[in-house]
């Protein structure tokens, strides 16, 4: 059987050797060039291929059309991925006649994503393993071919566990590869209810937080000890790395991080005591814990913790400037940031109608104003704040055709000024792009880094919003590349929930779909389905969306710098008609139903009569959320039906309280 292989690491070498032993004809191997900054403790796929005379490549973009055509020309019957670090596009996965298969270092569906061996140890698991599964565009989500379990012992480190998993991988492949050749395999779909996903780890994730239990800290030490960067802490500003430790079930009345003794070097934790068996001062040697204590002058009563200079800096709250703070996203984001307690919010908007619950908060500062007028205030606060979120935009479809020039002036020209202030004062900008930039993209799911951005002809003015946002995306990207602007672009996919628009805005047609439909129910007018409501969207609960946006602001390990991130819920895909039917069902069952007129039915209308000349719609808009999973460790959790119920309840409560009801 002919095979193309994507491989890296020891597991990659193991996979190639297993294929050769099973009689597969390997036509090409794709791997990664070694990263000089990485401590490479594993075998070289490139070297192994050279020894076996296999053609090996390391393209910068294996999904480039030239490489796709090259792989098609090889006509492989099977494709294998063994610890290859890049996602493969569907176009490549569709090439092999017998399928594409990946080897993942966990017992799926648990521990999808990056660094599963390290994460298993961090979480104190007692069992992991290796899984051979079909490849899909969703990472590690395809049907399972076979699994082999590996027991985790208390003394295991990431290195020893990796060795066990490698041996399990060899045994699994030896058993399954002959079956794959003959087609004698059975596939088991993954149980999504048991799925978990973990993102990449960075050296910063190794910091020891002494308020945790000694058991948890021991697990962290063994998860990141050599050859990984190691767990670490600080004595003042002096860094020490803990390479080996043990935990002691001993109570202590000392504050977490307090040194209890020098020899042995023992530290009080939130629960129990951690003994540092071996460690290393920055620039020093690997030594026993007692010697490390002497070298750093550590004595009983001193405390370890965060770097002293960093801790002092962290005492100041992070200042966040939100322009458009009264809007749907700005309002919910303010609530989330203030709840966290580490942020001070400066907000500007033309109204404070939804801000009453924040006005008296000591960390919330609001000015009523227009971004096109209050330019001096904006420039001063951009200079003053740490993170800038310009959320002001016209984002309702009817305005794209009704007021295209106003859309351009506000959404592009005014926001470009803000971008340039951020460049001038070297400030981090988190810019709200939009799912609209993908336009009529024909991909199954829209990928931030790969999908084409396709819009209609010039006379279709509805695209002025999309291209205004897209051009700003490109300008921000260019400023990042050429002038060092620190940015993140996020693209919301049909976020909805309480406070989305208002019934008054819906009355003049200037609202999003669900608000318009709720108005029809409240007023007793027919629900208007533009072009029959067949258009599909992926509806995302505002709570899920805000949690992802909060993590972008938090930016652990600076992972979000220079990134584009879709934020949406692919599993909540439904047509506008389906959404309307769910909404109607919840409306009829609502305790306030008797306040409103009878349901007036559905009415199909043409888009031209509803939106006017220049409108053009798209059939589907489904996000790839691989970047959100990888960078934010985020997954949407709330189903569309729940979101519709919350949104409906908010507007019905408001309508009854203001007297907008049926007599």
UniProtKB/Swiss-Prot annotation:
Give residues annotated as binding UDP-alpha-D-glucuronate.
395, 400, 434-435, 462, 494, 528-537, 615
Q: Does the keyword Plastid apply?
A: no
Region described as Formyltransferase ArnAFT: 1-304
What is this protein's name? Bifunctional polymyxin resistance protein ArnA
Q: How does it assemble?
A: Homohexamer, formed by a dimer of trimers.
Family in the record: In the N-terminal section; belongs to the Fmt family. UDP-L-Ara4N formyltransferase subfamily.
Site positions per UniProt: Transition state stabilizer: 102
Q: Per the record, what are the reactions this protein catalyses?
A: UDP-alpha-D-glucuronate + NAD(+) = UDP-beta-L-threo-pentopyranos-4-ulose + CO2 + NADH; UDP-4-amino-4-deoxy-beta-L-arabinose + (6R)-10-formyltetrahydrofolate = UDP-4-deoxy-4-formamido-beta-L-arabinose + (6S)-5,6,7,8-tetrahydrofolate + H(+)
One GO BP: lipid A biosynthetic process
Name the segments for region: Dehydrogenase ArnADH.
316-663
* Record-marked site positions (Raises pKa of active site His): 140
Per UniProt, where does (6R)-10-formyltetrahydrofolate bind?
A: 114, 136-140
Can you provide one Gene Ontology molecular function annotated for this UniProt record?
UDP-4-amino-4-deoxy-L-arabinose formyltransferase activity
Which keywords annotate this record?
A: Antibiotic resistance, Lipid A biosynthesis, Lipid biosynthesis, Lipid metabolism, Lipopolysaccharide biosynthesis, Multifunctional enzyme, NAD, Oxidoreductase, Transferase
This molecule's function is given as: Bifunctional enzyme that catalyzes the oxidative decarboxylation of UDP-glucuronic acid (UDP-GlcUA) to UDP-4-keto-arabinose (UDP-Ara4O) and the addition of a formyl group to UDP-4-amino-4-deoxy-L-arabinose (UDP-L-Ara4N) to form UDP-L-4-formamido-arabinose (UDP-L-Ara4FN). The modified arabinose is attached to lipid A and is required for resistance to polymyxin and cationic antimicrobial peptides.
Residue positions annotated to bind NAD(+) are: 349, 370-371
What Pfam families does the record tag this protein with?
Epimerase, Formyl_trans_C, Formyl_trans_N
Q: Where is the active site?
A: 104 (proton donor), 436 (proton acceptor), 621 (proton donor)
SUPFAM superfamilies in UniProt = FMT C-terminal domain-like (SSF50486), Formyltransferase (SSF53328), NAD(P)-binding Rossmann-fold domains (SSF51735)
Q: Which organism is it from?
A: Aeromonas salmonicida (strain A449)
Give the EC number(s) listed in the UniProt record.
2.1.2.13, 1.1.1.305
């Amino acid at each position: 059987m002919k095979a193309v292989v994507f491989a890296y690491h020891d597991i990659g070498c193991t996979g190639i050797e297993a294929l050769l032993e099973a009689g597969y004809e390997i036509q090409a191997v794709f791997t990664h060039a070694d990263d000089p900054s990485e401590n490479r403790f594993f075998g070289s796929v490139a070297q192994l291929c050279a020894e076996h005379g296999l053609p090996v490549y390391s393209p910068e973009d294996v999904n480039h059309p030239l490489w796709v055509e090259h792989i098609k020309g090889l006509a492989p019957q099977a494709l294998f991925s063994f610890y290859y670090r890049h996602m493969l596009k569907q176009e490549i996965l569709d090439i092999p006649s017998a399928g594409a298969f990946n080897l993942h270092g966990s017992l799926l569906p648990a521990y999808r994503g990056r660094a599963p061996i390290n994460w298993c140890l961090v979480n104190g698991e007692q069992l992991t393993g290796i899984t051979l599964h079909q490849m899909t565009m969703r990472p590690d989500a395809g049907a399972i071919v076979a699994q082999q379990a590996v027991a985790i012992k208390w003394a295991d480190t990431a290195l020893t566990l990796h060795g066990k998993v490698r041996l399990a991988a060899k045994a699994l492949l030896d058993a399954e590869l002959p079956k794959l050749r003959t087609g004698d395999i059975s596939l088991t779909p993954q149980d999504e209810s048991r799925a978990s996903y973990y993102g990449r780890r960075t050296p910063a994730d190794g910091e020891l937080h002494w308020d945790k239990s000694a058991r948890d800290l021991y697990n962290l030490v063994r998860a990141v000890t050599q050859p990984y960067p190691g767990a670490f802490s600080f004595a003042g500003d002096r860094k020490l790395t803990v390479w080996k430790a043990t935990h002691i079930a001993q109570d202590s009345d000392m504050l977490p991080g307090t040194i209890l003794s020098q020899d042995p070097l023992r530290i009080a934790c939130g629960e129990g005591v951690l003994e540092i068996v071996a460690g290393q001062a920055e620039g020093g040697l690997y030594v026993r814990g007692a010697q490390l204590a002497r070298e750093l002058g550590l004595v009983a009563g001193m405390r370890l913790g965060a770097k002293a200079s960093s801790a002092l800096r962290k005492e100041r709250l992070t200042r966040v400037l939100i322009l458009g703070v009264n809007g749907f996203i700005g309002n919910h984001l303010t609530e989330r940031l203030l709840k966290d307690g580490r942020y001070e919010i400066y907000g500007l908007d033309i109204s404070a109608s939804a801000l009453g619950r924040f006005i008296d908060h000591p960390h919330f500062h609001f000015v009523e104003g227009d971004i096109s007028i209050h330019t001096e205030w904006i420039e001063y606060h951009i200079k003053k704040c740490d993170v800038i979120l310009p959320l002001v935009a016209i984002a309702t479809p009817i305005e794209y055709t009704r007021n295209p020039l106003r859309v351009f002036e506000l959404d592009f020209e005014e926001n470009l000024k803000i971008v340039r202030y951020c460049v001038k004062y070297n400030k981090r900008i988190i810019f709200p792009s939009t799912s609209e930039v993908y336009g009529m993209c024909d991909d199954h799911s829209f990928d931030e880094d790969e999908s084409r951005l396709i819009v209609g002809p010039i006379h279709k003015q509805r695209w002025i919003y999309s291209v205004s946002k897209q051009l700003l995306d490109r300008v921000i990207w260019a400023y990042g590349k050429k002038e060092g602007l620190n940015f993140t672009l996020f693209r919301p996919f049909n976020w909805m929930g309480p406070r989305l628009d208002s019934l008054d805005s819906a009355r003049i047609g200037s609202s999003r779909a669900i608000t318009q439909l709720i108005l029809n129910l409240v007023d007793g007018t027919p629900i208007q389905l533009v072009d029959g409501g067949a258009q599909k969207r992926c509806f995302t609960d505002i709570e899920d969306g805000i949690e992802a946006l909060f993590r972008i602001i938090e930016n652990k390990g600076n992972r979000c710098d220079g990134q584009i991130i879709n934020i949406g819920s692919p599993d909540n895909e439904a047509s506008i008609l389906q959404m309307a039917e769910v909404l109607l069902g919840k409306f009829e069952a609502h305790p306030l139903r008797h306040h409103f007129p009878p349901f007036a039915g559905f009415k199909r209308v043409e888009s031209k009569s509803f939106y006017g000349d220049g409108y053009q719609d798209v059939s589907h808009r489904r996000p790839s959320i691989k970047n959100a999973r990888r960078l934010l460790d985020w997954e949407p959790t709330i189903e569309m039906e729940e979101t519709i119920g919350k949104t409906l309840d908010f507007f019905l409560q408001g309508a009854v309280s203001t007297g907008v009801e049926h007599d």
